[in-house]
């Protein structure tokens, strides 16, 4: 499987704040240069590189006289507005030494959850690669709200990897691999490869890194690996210090094997890029129809409605215990549905007209979770 690492023609690399900054929060020029030298080497081989980089907030701390990452959103956004310019400027200078141009792409959750925005992000990234530029992607921390944000760039990196149909995703942090437990505790050992979820049984995944300047931990990295491998993309998780060795196919870090079956891009987007705007509670018969027989969801099988959504929004379909079993694009507004619950399509068509004969969620717009 390591041969897929060296054979990858398009690579998405994600690096966290703690791997780019000094202990006081400023950008570490040596670390930035080391990363860019590695990625510049890939580009020199004719390989395409997309960099998903945290660090805007961390880079803005020192210039603003802050000694630690702020807890409140307003100060975080102020730091990001200062730090993002410093971060992209430093990258531009470093990549210029390799005769490479960078393009800044700032994304919000809304850009990924709205299908039209998602497709536009794809076109921008695709054109940058066609023009032999290096896209540098980050969450737009300056405008993201507390309620709707990625919070870390691990999930964003996995979504970008699928968006550009990459051959490899590399997650870099301050930890050299996924371990069976806390790396500082006796008895913990690194995990070389993960074939599927069964390989993680009994593994204590946790921790938020060592530096205190980032937001991601091992949990978010494993989740990002799950998302990317589910789309057929191999993932390598290792430290920034081992980036060159990892990209050279050396047996460092943890290699997550991809799923042999890739879902349709639209269903992948629905499952992983969208945020549900509501919940539809299903009776046992509807759960069986949707999950086991992959049927459309009809009003007759819904027992309750939660949330404020409009037709076309993503909603979660939950079982009698409240556990999400599927996600789909709903065909009705939330205010319409309560009067339709428990009624057959023929009854609705007779009472309200043929427009109400449609499914609540069509099977083509539904993905199991």
Swiss-Prot record:
Any one GO MF annotation of this record: glutamate 5-kinase activity
GO biological process, any: L-proline biosynthetic process
Positions with a binding annotation for substrate: 54, 141, 153
Keywords: Amino-acid biosynthesis, ATP-binding, Cytoplasm, Kinase, Nucleotide-binding, Proline biosynthesis, Transferase
Gene Ontology annotations for the cellular component aspect, listed alphabetically: cytosol
Pfam families named among the record's database cross-references: AA_kinase, PUA
Protein origin, superkingdom: Bacteria
EC code(s) of this entry: 2.7.2.11
Residues in PUA domain copies: 277-355
Pathway it works in: Amino-acid biosynthesis; L-proline biosynthesis; L-glutamate 5-semialdehyde from L-glutamate: step 1/2
Cellular localization per UniProt: Cytoplasm
Residues that hold ATP according to the record: 14, 173-174, 215-221
Function recorded in the entry: Catalyzes the transfer of a phosphate group to glutamate to form L-glutamate 5-phosphate.
Homology family: Belongs to the glutamate 5-kinase family.
Protein name: Glutamate 5-kinase
Source species of the chain: Salinispora arenicola (strain CNS-205)
């Amino acid at each position: 499987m390591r041969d897929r690492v060296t054979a990858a023609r398009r690579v998405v690399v994600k690096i966290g704040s703690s791997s780019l900054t000094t202990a006081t929060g400023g950008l570490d020029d040596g670390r930035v240069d080391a990363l860019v030298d590695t990625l510049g080497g890939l580009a020199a081989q004719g390989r395409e590189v997309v960099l998903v980089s945290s660090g805007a907030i961390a880079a803005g701390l020192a210039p603003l006289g802050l000694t630690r990452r702020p807890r409140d959103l307003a100060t975080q956004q102020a730091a990001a507005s200062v730090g993002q310019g410093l971060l992209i400027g430093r990258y531009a200078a470093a990549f210029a030494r390799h005769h490479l141009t960078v393009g800044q792409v700032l994304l919000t959750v809304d850009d990924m959850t709205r299908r039209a925005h998602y497709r536009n992000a794809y076109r921008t990234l695709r054109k940058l690669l066609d023009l032999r530029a290096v896209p540098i992607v980050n969450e737009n921390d300056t405008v993201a709200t507390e309620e709707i944000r990625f919070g870390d760039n691990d999930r964003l990196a996995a979504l970008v990897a699928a968006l550009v149909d990459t051959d490899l995703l590399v997650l870099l942090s301050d930890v050299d691999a996924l371990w069976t437990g806390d790396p500082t505790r006796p008895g913990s050992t690194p995990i070389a490869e993960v074939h599927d979820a069964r390989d993680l049984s009994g593994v204590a995944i946790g921790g938020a890194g060592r530096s205190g300047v980032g937001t991601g931990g091992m949990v978010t990295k494993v989740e990002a690996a799950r998302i990317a491998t589910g789309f057929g993309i191999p993932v390598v998780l290792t430290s920034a210090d081992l980036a060159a060795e990892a990209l050279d196919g050396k047996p460092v870090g943890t290699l997550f094997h991809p799923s042999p079956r890739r879902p349709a891009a639209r269903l992948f987007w629905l499952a992983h890029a969208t945020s549900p705007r509501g919940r539809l509670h299903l009776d046992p018969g509807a759960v069986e129809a949707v999950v086991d027989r992959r049927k459309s969801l009809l009003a007759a099988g819904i027992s309750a409605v939660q949330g404020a959504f409009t037709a076309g929004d993503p909603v979660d379909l939950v079982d009698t215990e409240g556990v999400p079993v599927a996600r789909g694009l709903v065909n009705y507004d939330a205010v319409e549905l309560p009067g339709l619950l428990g009624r057959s399509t023929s009854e609705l068509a007779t009472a309200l007209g043929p427009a109400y004969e449609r499914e609540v969620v069509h099977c083509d717009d539904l993905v199991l979770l």
